């Protein structure tokens, strides 16, 4: 769409997160900085109802428990019924059997529109061999673009692989997003924030492939701008929020760096 950020700030979509306890505060603030409204409702007694009044659902398995996974399934079912986008951030898949089983349970039980993870996490979900150290990517043994395309076809979801270059595929098309800065990898939480950003862009754009590209371009441009004013991770994190808050569609269009394959 022509002016997604303007649309977000005018409509202020409510983005329901069931996310991890490490970065929940960061995801809420990043959602707000873009102009959307965050809500973090995890309890099974209310989560589906909260999803029912939201414009997108973002699930993050960074700190999984059986109870939280149950809430994710309830909310995702409500999102499917309402036909709002569901984003799954597969944090730490490949690190433990429990995470792998819970991710598979979600994907096997409900419709997930956008599946996000680093190269290792997506490779593991796609059945490829991959090495993961905690929640950090280490290495994969196959072409990531090929993995993204094949997994998108298999899952009927948009696949987002984040790394030095971000790979997005709907099974037929591929975007390679080159915006961003290495300082984004120096603070905990930018990957989780990226999932929130994808969710809020998908809330206003039903083309989830295009929405994912827009989200990562906008977030990456903000990272580039923040790095110019930063001396290290601490100042960078503060500046990242400020640059997102001060972004405009015109500014991002002049700095977008991506290619389509």
Swiss-Prot record:
GO biological process entries: thiamine biosynthetic process; thiamine diphosphate biosynthetic process
Residues reported in the UniProt entry to bind ATP: 116, 162
Cofactor entry: Mg(2+)
Protein name (database record): Hydroxyethylthiazole kinase
Molecular function (Gene Ontology), one example: hydroxyethylthiazole kinase activity
Keywords: ATP-binding, Kinase, Magnesium, Metal-binding, Nucleotide-binding, Thiamine biosynthesis, Transferase
Pfam families named among the record's database cross-references: HK
Reaction(s) the record says it catalyses: 5-(2-hydroxyethyl)-4-methylthiazole + ATP = 4-methyl-5-(2-phosphooxyethyl)-thiazole + ADP + H(+)
EC number: 2.7.1.50
Family designation: Belongs to the Thz kinase family.
Residues where substrate binds: 40, 189
Cystine crosslinks: none
Role, per record: Catalyzes the phosphorylation of the hydroxyl group of 4-methyl-5-beta-hydroxyethylthiazole (THZ).
Known pathway: Cofactor biosynthesis; thiamine diphosphate biosynthesis; 4-methyl-5-(2-phosphoethyl)-thiazole from 5-(2-hydroxyethyl)-4-methylthiazole: step 1/1
Keyword Cell membrane: no
Gene designation per UniProt: thiM
Matches recorded under SUPFAM superfamilies: Ribokinase-like
NCBIfam families: PRK09355.1, thiM
Coiled-coil zones: none
CDD domains cross-referenced by the UniProt entry: THZ_kinase (cd01170)
């Amino acid at each position: 769409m022509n002016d997604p950020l303007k649309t977000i700030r005018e409509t202020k979509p409510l983005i329901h997160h069931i996310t991890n306890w490490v970065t929940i505060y960061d995801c809420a603030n990043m959602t707000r900085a873009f102009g959307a409204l965050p809500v973090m409702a995890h309890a099974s007694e209310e989560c589906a109802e909260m999803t029912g009044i939201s414009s997108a659902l973002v699930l993050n398995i960074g700190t999984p428990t059986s109870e939280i996974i149950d809430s994710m399934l309830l909310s995702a079912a409500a999102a499917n019924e309402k036909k709002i986008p569901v984003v799954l951030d597969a944090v730490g898949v490949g690190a433990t059997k429990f995470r792998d089983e819970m991710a598979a349970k979600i994907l096997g039980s409900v419709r997930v529109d956008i599946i996000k993870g680093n190269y290792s996490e997506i490779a593991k979900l796609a059945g490829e061999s991959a090495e993961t150290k905690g929640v950090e990517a280490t290495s994969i043994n196959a072409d990531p673009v090929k993995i993204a395309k094949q997994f998108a076809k298999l899952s009927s979801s948009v696949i987002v692989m984040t790394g030095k270059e971000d790979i997005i595929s709907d099974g037929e098309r591929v975007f390679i997003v080159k915006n961003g800065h290495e300082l984004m990898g120096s603070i905990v939480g930018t990957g989780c924030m990226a999932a929130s950003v994808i969710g809020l862009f998908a809330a206003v754009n039903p083309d989830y492939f295009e929405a994912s590209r827009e989200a990562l371009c906008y977030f990456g441009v903000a990272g580039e701008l923040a790095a110019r004013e930063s001396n290290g991770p601490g100042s960078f994190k503060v500046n990242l929020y400020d640059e997102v808050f001060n972004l405009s569609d015109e500014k991002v269009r002049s700095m977008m760096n991506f290619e389509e394959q």
